[in-house]
């Protein structure tokens, strides 16, 4: 195969030449490499430079770039796997070319995950991670990282696929990115607790074309019970902006307290925090020390996540303003007004028009209408 040299972060590697006229790289490339996922990989390098696990598994290596970067930029022992022998040959060549050491395996991901355990396991499949989640939850000793690019099923745009893959009820709302992230996290949590293990989110976020989880696995039935307690449902009114969340593994009938419409259940999904605040501080401190091409974007992401409320939904600022009527002030003014009146309020990291708050609708209306 014809190869070209690429540098990402501090790592130089080779990838197959891809047809620039191809609508999507896998249709033309013998080994897949997606340059649009650079921020995803930068986030992994940044986080691992803080966590420093004993060993890291890149379960679906492809070109091997993620594992290569972890080995070279974090100095962490790596195992890079891909079931395609051509990909494995390229990974070995890239390791040798970069002067790095690492174990390369050529196996079905589920077979490898079922046979061996690793301190940190990273799932970055093409599409849904659902077929690999069970084995990954058993294989990960301390850390489990998951990428999902099947955002349409997770966010409710492809409802039946979301139900089939994740055994949950998504809904395509204005806060669909939040729903998708929490459904994915809830699915992994429900898988983990089957083995009397729990989890805690370390650094989870939604981007334009993927969802990314960085999780810490916890041992024991008590940890599993704490994890179950963080699962629940979001109830959405289809007739007005009212919504509410409720912990529990089974949905209940809810009637909108504002308009009397039967509310729609979303879930089960994860309720509560999506990140560890102390860890975000450590990552922000480490960020300037790494040569990351998406340093600025990551810095902004960390800043927003640090103050973002853990509510499981948001109000789209334009929609809520239209519902209330009038000409609203800037979103930051409304956030400040809500905070001044004793409520919590923030932006969301995945949308510039998202307003997150624990204030009731009447208080939001007052903040929007005040002169």
Swiss-Prot record:
NCBIfam families: TRM1. Gene3D superfamilies: N2,N2-dimethylguanosine tRNA methyltransferase, C-terminal domain (3.30.56.70), Vaccinia Virus protein VP39 (3.40.50.150). It is an enzyme of class 2 (transferase). InterPro entries: SAM-dependent_MTases_sf (IPR029063), Trm1 (IPR002905), TRM1_arc_bac (IPR022923), tRNA_met_Trm1_C (IPR042296). GO terms for biological process: tRNA N2-guanine methylation. Zn(2+) binds at residues 237, 240, 256, 259. The gene is trm1. One of its GO terms (molecular function) is tRNA (guanine(26)-N2)-dimethyltransferase activity. Dimethylates a single guanine residue at position 26 of a number of tRNAs using S-adenosyl-L-methionine as donor of the methyl groups. Keywords: Metal-binding, Methyltransferase, RNA-binding, S-adenosyl-L-methionine, Transferase, tRNA processing, tRNA-binding, Zinc. Pfam families: TRM. This is tRNA (guanine(26)-N(2))-dimethyltransferase. PROSITE patterns: SAM_MT_TRM1. SUPFAM superfamilies: S-adenosyl-L-methionine-dependent methyltransferases. Belongs to the class I-like SAM-binding methyltransferase superfamily. Trm1 family. It catalyses: guanosine(26) in tRNA + 2 S-adenosyl-L-methionine = N(2)-dimethylguanosine(26) in tRNA + 2 S-adenosyl-L-homocysteine + 2 H(+).
């Amino acid at each position: 195969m014809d190869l070209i040299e690429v540098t990402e972060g501090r790592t130089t590697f080779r990838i197959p030449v891809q047809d620039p006229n191809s609508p999507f790289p896998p249709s033309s490339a013998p080994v897949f490499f997606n340059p649009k996922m650079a921020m995803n990989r930068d986030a992994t390098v940044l986080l691992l430079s803080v966590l420093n696990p004993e060993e890291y598994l890149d379960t679906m290596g492809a070109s091997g770039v993620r594992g290569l970067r972890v080995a070279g930029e974090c100095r962490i022992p790596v195992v890079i796997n891909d079931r395609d022998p051509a990909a494995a040959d390229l990974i070995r060549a890239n390791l040798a070319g970069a002067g790095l050491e690492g174990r390369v395996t050529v196996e079905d991901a589920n077979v490898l995950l079922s046979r061996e355990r690793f301190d940190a396991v990273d799932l970055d499949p093409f599409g849904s991670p659902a077929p690999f989640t069970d084995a990954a939850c058993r294989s990960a000793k301390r850390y489990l990282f998951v990428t999902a690019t099947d955002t349409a099923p997770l966010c409710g745009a492809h409802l039946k696929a979301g139900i089939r893959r994740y055994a949950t009820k998504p809904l395509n709302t204005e806060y669909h990115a939040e729903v998708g992230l929490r459904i994915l996290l809830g699915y992994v949590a429900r898988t983990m607790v089957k083995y009397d293990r729990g989890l805690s989110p370390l650094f989870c976020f939604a981007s334009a074309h993927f969802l990314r989880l960085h999780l810490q696995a916890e041992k024991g039935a008590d940890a599993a019970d704490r994890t179950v307690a963080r699962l629940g449902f979001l109830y959405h009114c289809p007739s007005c902006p009212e919504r509410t969340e409720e912990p529990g593994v089974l949905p209940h009938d809810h009637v909108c307290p504002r308009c009397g419409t039967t509310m729609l259940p979303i879930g089960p999904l994860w309720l509560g925090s999506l990140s560890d605040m102390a860890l975000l501080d450590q990552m922000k401190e480490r960020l300037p020390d790494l040569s990351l091409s998406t340093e600025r974007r990551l810095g902004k992401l960390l800043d927003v996540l640090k103050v973002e409320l853990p509510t499981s939904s948001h109000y789209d600022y334009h929609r809520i303003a239209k519902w209330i009527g009038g000409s609203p002030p800037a979103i930051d003014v409304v956030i400040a007004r809500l905070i001044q009146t004793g409520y919590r309020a923030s932006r969301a990291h995945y949308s510039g028009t998202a307003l997150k708050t624990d204030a009731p609708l009447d208080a939001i209306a007052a903040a929007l209408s005040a002169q």
